[in-house]
Curated annotation (Swiss-Prot):
Cofactor binding summary note: Binds 2 Mg(2+) ions per subunit. Mn(2+), Co(2+) and Cd(2+) are also accepted.
Superkingdom as given in the UniProt entry: Bacteria
Protein name as it appears in the record: Ribose-phosphate pyrophosphokinase
pH dependence (UniProt free text): Optimum pH is 9.7-9.8.
UniProt catalytic activity: D-ribose 5-phosphate + ATP = 5-phospho-alpha-D-ribose 1-diphosphate + AMP + H(+)
Heme as UniProt keyword: no
Species the sequence originates in: Escherichia coli (strain K12)
A Pfam family hit: Pribosyltran_N
Amino-acid positions noted as binding Mg(2+) 2 in the UniProt annotation, renumbered to this chain: D170
CDD domains: PRTases_typeI
Positions contributing to D-ribose 5-phosphate binding: R196, D220, D224, T225, G226, G227, T228
InterPro entries per UniProt: PRib_PP_synth_CS, Pribosyltran_N, PRibTrfase_dom, PRTase-like, Rib-P_diPkinase, Rib-P_diPkinase_bac
Amino acid sequence: MPDMKLFAGNATPELAQRIANRLYTSLGDAAVGRFSDGEVSVQINENVRGGDIFIIQSTCAPTNDNLMELVVMVDALRRASAGRITAVIPYFGYARQDRRVRSARVPITAKVVADFLSSVGVDRVLTVDLHAEQIQGFFDVPVDNVFGSPILLEDMLQLNLDNPIVVSPDIGGVVRARAIAKLLNDTDMAIIDKRRPRANVSQVMHIIGDVAGRDCVLVDDMIDTGGTLCKAAEALKERGAKRVFAYATHPIFSGNAANNLRNSVIDEVVVCDTIPLSDEIKSLPNVRTLTLSGMLAEAIRRISNEESISAMFEH
């Protein structure tokens, strides 16, 4: 069996180190930096010939820099005769650009990124909670899309929730919310119906379901500016919700997110470590982070040993 080796770019160094610790190994020796003109510089400083290589790199902000680091690392490892290269992308950037809106002259950038990764020599992709699962079909290589929900659910069960109800922040998240509700002792579910007049701005319209006197658990795959989340929490509290907790896998937290969360009525926001948090976000008392390092380490181990990934999520 080829030697398994882990490498990491500069996007998620702490998560990469946690994964390495879980696998009782160390991160590979690679210098990933910049030339004086800002171009990505990569040098692999150890033998990888024939190795089973995993590169851990979220393509979060700065998205283009992190994406270029990833593809240049793949090329360096491919030219060094690596046996198999798996791109471990905890947060897959550009995933929201997954379709062309009718009559709009826009790209399908998620497909562009998939082609880019395939063209430089990625053999397999491991990612977490793709914004749209059909993005897997954009790739010409196998994609393992694992779920953060077991980690989030385990934390929810520790909250001692009072008459809980799972809330989907929009119609598109109903499937995710229903799955969480079923696992959370088959609890009830509510849906927030909203309109989005422009990007990153949403207006809550009404709530489908009775939330009065109940602990509400909002679930989503990501939090961007937090505007949608904060308006949803306000609507829930206005309709009598007792407490509001928000759970999401990917903490993008762009723009005015810190200020939005600081002034929000949300009791607690719980996210995963697929994207590093800024110091400002870390300082907020109502934001808490869970690690996916154990789950990702197990997925990497299974891929390396040619074992089933889907078996990790069988209940």
